UniProtKB/Swiss-Prot annotation:
It comes from the Bacteria. NCBIfam families: guaA_Cterm (TIGR00884), guaA_Nterm (TIGR00888), PRK00074.1 (NF000848). GO terms for cellular component: cytosol. Homodimer. CDD domains: GATase1_GMP_Synthase, GMP_synthase_C. This is GMP synthase [glutamine-hydrolyzing]. ATP binds at residues 230-236.
Length: 520
């Protein structure tokens, strides 16, 4: 497969909306390639990118404020369809002579969009009996529609909520079609990229694999490649994909740091070394990691220690493979976006990432990142296509530092062993009760505090384990999962009875925000 799957592409310009990555994911779900770039992308770069269409995202600013984010005026003269969402619609309206003012009544949440006049092809199937439920999030609105544009949607509080200029192929919506709270929003984005922009939908798992295999072979040639295999989804799929491309030229290094889930090391070896025939070097480094972490309780310092030691051990092993020229990583597109944002100052680096930018300059290997264009759901889809086990591909996210950041405070072997067993019981019960696939992320946390208990006729003074389970579509916000009481009771009873050293189990009912999903 050639690079044809990239020939039809959509450009998304980001004005700072919390939902911008969701726009990209919806475009990809329509089987069309897209990239996300800052709103101030140079016009020459946009021309070179040659998009079939452009989407302007929402954003937190007001278009009439001094210094408000804007695009080069010639953007609208490129002759490709443009869809403005929320701030993007207001920006486009103002550019063509319309007016944007503060709304008398701000709209946040659900609203009914009512069809006005004759909505164009973008809205085919979007309105049912003249209306469509949508999700609003705006404090400004368009008060005067620019010449050439027609209003095709309104709500009770905003008379201009959807506009179109069919002659110039320009469209704007005040609502957010990218979020799940707009039920037919996915259809609207699909219609824009497929019907309005004319993309045929070549971005499919099979085509992505064929394209990646061709590119890996062209990039690597006959060179040797090494990859740090963690057992997580991203590195596992990267390993399977690279092995599909170059076979025995790939050697994986699996560093068992003593902070993995129960029996995870054996499972990784069984999947890759035994079933797929991948060359895997397993390094038992538990003692080195626990020694390095001794006495350290600061979460960020623990992350740095674990990350640095992993690189040190990986380098030791890679030096033994003297003819290796490439280092492969399971970097995915959100990692790339987040790291770029941190460099440009347009995003905050909340937690250090275990993967992107973590390699020292003295490692002279060239970088191979076959997943760097893909979102997590796309990675999972190609993982299944490559034949990886369903449970491995669809397992919940696991942090790079492993249990090191699920043990609060200092990491000790005793704590890790307790947490491993408690977590395994928790996950086993979630599977058995049919909850696991409904939950976005679930895990146990070890709390280094003891509480008084009673077992039999004796008093106990043992540790506390917290259970966390959340539901989320994007991991930017998350709600706690309402696990039924009878399931909580069964899980708690099993952990207390089967895991020595625990006499109390608690359930975390914090949402994100204000809490993060992980405890550290």
């Amino acid at each position: 497969m050639s690079s044809d799957i990239h020939s039809e592409k959509i450009l998304i310009l980001d004005f700072g909306s919390q939902y911008t990555q969701l726009i990209a994911r919806r475009v990809r779900e329509a089987h069309v390639y897209c990239e996300l770039h800052p709103f101030d992308m140079d016009l020459a770069a946009i021309r070179a990118f040659a998009p079939r269409g452009i989407i302007l995202s929402g954003g937190p600013k007001s278009v009439y404020e001094e210094g408000a984010p804007a695009v080069e005026e010639a953007l609208f003269e490129l002759g490709v369809p443009v869809l403005g969402i929320c701030y993007g619609m207001q920006l486009m309206s103002r550019h063509f002579g319309g007016q944007v003012v503060p709304a008398g009544k701000r709209e946040f949440g659900h609203a009914d969009l009512l069809a006005v006049g004759t909505p164009g092809p973008l809205f085919d199937g979007f309105f049912v009996e003249g209306k469509s439920p949508v999700w609003m999030s705006h404090g400004d609105h368009v008060s005067l529609v620019p010449a050439g544009f027609q209003v095709v949607g309104e709500t009770a509080n905003a008379p201009v909520c959807a506009i179109q200029d069919l002659a110039r192929n320009l469209y704007g919506v005040q609502f957010h079609p990218e979020v799940n709270h707009t039920p037919r929003g996915e259809l609207l984005i699909d219609t824009f990229v497929r019907k309005i922009c004319g993309c045929s939908g070549q971005w499919t798992p099979g085509h992505i694999i064929d394209d990646a295999v061709s590119r890996i072979r062209a990039q690597v040639g006959n060179d040797r490649v090494i990859l740090g295999l963690s057992g997580g989804v991203d590195s596992s799929v990267a390993a399977a994909l690279i092995h599909r491309a170059i076979g025995d030229q790939l050697t994986c290094v699996f560093v068992d740091n003593g902070l993995l889930r129960l029996s995870e090391g054996d499972q990784v070896m069984a999947t890759f070394a035994e079933n797929l025939g991948v060359k895997v070097i397993r390094v038992d480094a538990e003692d080195r990691f626990l020694t390095a972490l001794a006495g350290e309780s600061d979460p960020e310092k623990k992350r740095k220690i674990i990350g640095k030691l992993f690189v040190d051990i990986f380098e030791e092993e890679s030096n033994k493979i003297t003819d290796a020229r490439w280092l492969a990583q399971g970097t995915i597109y959100p990692d790339v976006i987040e790291s770029a944002g941190a460099k440009t100052g347009k995003a905050h680096n909340i937690k250090s990432h275990h993967n992107v930018g973590g390699l020292p300059d003295y490692m002279k290997l060239k970088l191979l990142e076959p997943l760097r264009e893909l979102f997590k759901d796309e990675v999972r889809a190609i993982g299944e296509e490559l034949g990886l086990p369903h449970q491995m591909v669809w397992r919940h996210p696991f942090p790079g530092p492993g249990l090191g950041v699920r043990i609060l405070g200092e990491v000790k072997k005793e704590y890790a062993d307790i947490l491993r067993r408690a977590d395994a019981i928790y996950i086993e019960e979630l599977y058995a009760a049919g909850h696991y696939d409904k939950i976005s992320q679930a895990f146990a946390v070890f709390l280094p505090v003891k509480s008084v208990g009673v077992m039999g006729d004796g008093r106990t003074y043992e540790y506390v384990v917290a259970l966390r389970a959340v539901e989320t579509k994007d991991f930017m916000t998350a709600g706690w999962y309402p696990l039924p009481y009878e399931d909580m009771a069964r899980i708690s009873s099993r952990i207390i009875n089967e895991v020595k050293g625990v006499n109390r189990v608690v359930y975390d009912i914090s949402s994100k925000p204000p809490a993060t999903i992980e405890w550290e």
